[in-house]
Amino acid sequence: MNIALKDMFLRLWKKYFDGAELPIAFYYTNEEKVAENDPATSGRCLIENLIKVRMGTPLRFGKNSIGCPGGRRYAGFSATLSENFEYFLSCGIPGVVEGERYKKSPELVREVMKKFPEFEAPNNFIVFKRWDQLDESDEPKVVIFFAKPDVLAGLFTLANFDEIEEGVLAPFGSGCSSIILHPYLEGENNPPHCVLGMFDISARPYVHSEIQTFAVPIAKFDRMVENMQESFLITSTWEKIRNRIIPS
């Protein structure tokens, strides 16, 4: 990766968002240098597993080390849906599967899934690292912020700083789809959009009540970092917000 970009972001993040949690990033690889997640001893939800990464422990995941079938699918390691998925996401089947009731009917779920983007992982593993732990050989594809409202407001505004159209999307989906699948695929678009996420009610128990995610394709992230020192971040308006950011 571009070490100059890494160092520049760390310096500017401390200057304009001092105390806010550092983002994490992911990349795909066939190498096994980073320790692999053990689903037998870790939580089933990928968002729960990422707490370790946010605290500074890099983790590698593959098709056999993600406990949730949804996590495997949205990381690109499985193309299949779990049995009765359309009922699981909607009304359920008494005595068979409890429904999450996130969609009104099984029929609606089927139509939604027809339009849901397909995605196959380019390599055998996905590796998550906190931004400050990335090294020169890493090639991050997406940068993920776990952010409280004031920080989120800053990121959202910065993402739109050099855009004519809206720079941020908020697609319906699981917590893991909002930080992996959607922003990864956005990285292939021109221009790429940031993805606001963690609206998944099932994933929210694994983040603080005030936390949302803000996932940024690396090409977009590069531009955002370059724009920081000429944006609203240098104004007295932002200084008022910056001064009340509570350390994570």
Predicted ranges, named:
Residues 5-248:
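Acidic, serine/proline-rich low-complexity intrinsically disordered regions
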Residues 1-2:
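Ferredoxin-type iron-sulfur electron-transfer modules and their immediate structural context
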